[in-house]
Amino acid sequence: MSDERRSSARWPVAVTVKVTLQNGHAFDSNILNVNLGGCFLGEVAGLREMDVVLLHSYYNPKLNGIYAQVIWVVEEPGLRGVGVRFQPMDDAQKFELVRWFNQVVGR
């Protein structure tokens, strides 16, 4: 793991999200840890570094459409998934992300 991936504190969570690919295909995944810059999506296969996905959270408050780019891929026994970085967003999306983040990490 690079230092860049571990430079910010992460909070363990178990939040279901809908992941939509650029081709429109969608599936559910679980966020295993999160910070305000990105998250780790568990049990995701077939994505490559630099792919962009759209995330929607079912958790209340809902997270309505945050774009994220795959930064790293893990395919090891016992752990498979992708680390994603949230893409630039407008002020309303930032507010929504912070509100959602505070709820899911219990702050």
Q: Which ranges hold each PLM region?
A:
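Short, charged/polar, Gly/Pro-enriched secondary-structure boundary elements
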Residues: M89-K94
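Short, solvent-exposed secondary-structure boundary/capping segments
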Residues: F40-E43, E76-F86
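Short conserved beta-strand and strand-loop elements enriched in small hydrophobics
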Residues: V15-L21, M50-L63
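Short, conserved beta-turn/loop elements at beta-strand boundaries and strand-helix junctions
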Residues: Q22, L36-G37, V73-G78
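N-terminal helix initiation/capping motif
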Residues: M1-V34, E96-R107
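Short, surface-exposed secondary-structure edge patches
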Residues: S8, G42-R48
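Short beta-strand-centered aromatic/proline hotspots
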Residues: S29-N30, G65-W72
